[in-house]
């Protein structure tokens, strides 16, 4: 191959490479789409977005959508919102939906809601079509001790002005559950609640539970009310069982004290008997001492012995007569 032919080949390759690099870096197709939609975006501005690491197709497509919907939004605001971490497409869709529904919503407000982590499009849709939140089963006890289990359906509408900083669905569910428990607990009888379930919804709705939340409560409907356990009877049974245990404990304490007192009395009796035996053992010693010292004579001692023997004989005879009295009567 000659040198001129090789040069032309290299030149062609370089030109093709430059064209590929140009079309891959410069969004010509996107620029043509914007021009066809009568959206004025300079091609050098798109190159600048590339350099700022902003996908041009996201910004330009969102701008085209906004222009076709009649929204006046600058491309700088869209790019700034993207750089702040927002979802540009969702914000534009929310603005279009709000415009169609007649809701007053500006770009700055929608962008703030989106950056706050809220789904601004869903919020606009909930403003138009309220959402139904079903609470879990809530149990409450009426004043007669009967447990009631209720389930409520809460219809809420999103409040655009309170989305930033307002509480979410969990707060609504918790407040409604608290109101249901309070209403059931204030009822004198569970039959009142069963006969008029709407008394729960009226009472709860009148408390203004949507204060400080991102929603407006439209209605509260009681879906189901079931009768649970007899909590009052169970509490009374538990109280009676506790009193029984306390009475048994006190009785056991008194029995233990009586047993201890009996043991003490037995020990005291044994001590007294020991003293009597000890005193009886001192009598012969005292007699012997008296005989030695001459305070008592031998005749007196013998007379005392005879007296003791007579006394013992009479006691023996008296005991025998008492034991054999029926026999003695037969002899007579």
UniProtKB/Swiss-Prot annotation:
Keywords: Cell membrane, Membrane, Transmembrane, Transmembrane helix. Homooligomerizes. Its main location: membrane. Found in functional membrane microdomains (FMM) that may be equivalent to eukaryotic membrane rafts. FMMs are highly dynamic and increase in number as cells age. Flotillins are thought to be important factors in membrane fluidity. InterPro entries: FloA. This is Flotillin-like protein FloA. It is a multi-pass membrane protein. Belongs to the flotillin-like FloA family. It is found in: Cell membrane; Membrane raft. It comes from the Bacteria. One of its GO terms (cellular component) is plasma membrane.
